[in-house]
Regions:
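A generic structural signal for short hydrophobic patches within well-formed alpha-helices
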Residues: 28, 104-105
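Active-site-adjacent beta-strand/loop module that shapes the phosphate/pyrophosphate-binding cleft
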Residues: 60-86, 97-103, 113-125
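Hydrophobic pocket/interface hotspot
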Residues: 11, 38, 42, 96
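A short local loop/turn or secondary-structure capping micro-motif enriched for an aromatic residue
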Residues: 17-20, 39, 88, 115
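The catalytic Nudix box helix
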Residues: 23-55
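N-terminal strand-loop-strand
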Residues: 1-23, 50-54
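Non-DNA-binding regulatory cores of transcription-related proteins
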Residues: 88-89, 93-94
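Structured beta->alpha junctions
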Residues: 12, 27, 57-59
């Protein structure tokens, strides 16, 4: 998770006629730790480089285990990149944006069960 005061970086999606948002992230490759995967995915999807401050919590996303990390020492400017940029088209769009807690429901932040914990985290850091 990349925070900026009371905002978190999300990827707004439009796919198969559905609008929603997710946190940048993805799968763990063979031989990779979850922390290494989080840093790699962040860079691949956003061009940002960061360090991990700490693991925040674990859960499930799309029926797969998910580990959520708080990023620190974030460098660069968030720009869509990697497979998401290559696949970006009107019927399958990707857009990086900063979101406040009061925008989570409107954006359809997924998975929905992280909204409350993330809102608390933003309230403490904002």
């Amino acid at each position: 998770m990349v925070l900026d005061g009371d905002r978190v970086l999300v990827m707004k999606r439009h796919k198969r006629g559905r609008d929603y948002a997710v946190l940048p992230g993805g799968g763990v490759e063979p031989g990779e730790t979850t922390a290494e995967a989080a840093l790699r995915e962040l860079h691949e999807e956003t061009t940002l480089v960061a360090e991990i401050d700490r693991m925040l919590w674990t859960g499930r996303h799309n029926d797969r285990p998910a580990t959520y990390f708080l990023m620190t020492a974030v460098r660069g400017q968030a720009r869509l990149s990697g497979p998401e940029a290559a696949a970006n088209r009107p019927d399958n769009s990707f857009e990086l944006r900063w979101a406040t807690a009061d925008q989570f429901a409107e954006l359809g932040l997924h998975p929905a069960d992280i909204r409350g914990r993330l809102a608390q985290l933003l309230a403490r850091s904002g």
